[in-house]
């Protein structure tokens, strides 16, 4: 299994979607993550694991913590933690719709899509 995600450092794609998932209480998380791993190529789909998810799996990662919120005069930078973040990257908008549906089906029963942010270049 390749653990690198080259999409993180790649150029900005023409279209993207950021999907933020909430872990469902009492759900079997590990099997859903294994299904997700099979879809993740690190280029078209980049995955980020939140601190709450990592801790619920009993596998803490040194240095991993929730992003703090900041407030400066005229500027708020909120903290928007999620259990799981998926960054979909594509040159076609239609691909993102299909990928989003596939991810929701793959993670069903363990995660719920909480927020989606679409982006374009």
Feature annotation, model-predicted:
Residues 1-121:
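Long, low-complexity, Ser/Thr/Gly/Pro-rich intrinsically disordered segments that act as flexible linkers
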